[in-house]
């Protein structure tokens, strides 16, 4: 039997950081709260605006993009956190992040001096693993070609 009520436990969790509804529900289930009590606690949190998936999604995108994570991987991670697709798309469109500039910064950090086909493939895989699309990498290759012309 849990020590605190589900609402009190939610307040405790949300006082530390934002959570998605899905994550909160899982935490309450792990603590073995009753299903009705879980539903009541989550409704209470949403009514009082303690928990908001839209706000969580926006802050998650800001935070992870600062770590060099691209839009594709962000979508995947947010889906795993139980955020609905329409919310993810909306927040990615509303964000002021320039994904091409972010890809350039990341690319410059990791780009080796020696440039050959193997290195190009390795960098392409790296950028894909970070969640960037092929169009971002194509943009980087265009910039690379332009910089070689001026050398």
From Swiss-Prot:
This is Regulatory protein RecX. PANTHER family: REGULATORY PROTEIN RECX FAMILY PROTEIN. One of its GO terms (biological process) is regulation of DNA repair. The keyword Cell inner membrane does not apply. It is found in: Cytoplasm. Belongs to the RecX family. Keywords: Cytoplasm. InterPro entries: RecX_HTH_1st, RecX_HTH_2nd, Regulatory_RecX, WH-like_DNA-bd_sf. GO terms for cellular component: cytoplasm. NCBIfam families: PRK00117.3-3 (NF001057). The keyword Protein biosynthesis does not apply. Modulates RecA activity.
């Amino acid at each position: 039997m849990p020590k605190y009520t589900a609402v009190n436990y939610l307040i405790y969790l949300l006082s530390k950081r934002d959570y998605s509804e899905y994550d909160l529900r899982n935490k309450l289930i792990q603590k073995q709260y009753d299903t009705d009590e879980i539903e009541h606690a989550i409704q209470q949190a949403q009514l009082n605006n303690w928990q908001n998936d839209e706000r969580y999604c926006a802050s998650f995108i800001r935070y992870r993009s600062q770590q060099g994570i691209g839009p594709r991987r962000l979508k995947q991670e947010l889906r795993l956190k139980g955020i609905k697709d329409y919310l993810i798309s909306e927040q990615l469109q509303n964000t002021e992040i320039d994904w091409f500039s972010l890809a350039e910064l990341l690319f410059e950090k990791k780009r080796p001096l020696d440039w050959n086909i193997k290195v190009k493939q390795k960098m392409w895989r790296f950028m894909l693993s970070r969640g960037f699309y092929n169009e971002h990498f194509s943009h980087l290759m265009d910039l690379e070609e332009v910089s070689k012309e001026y050398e």
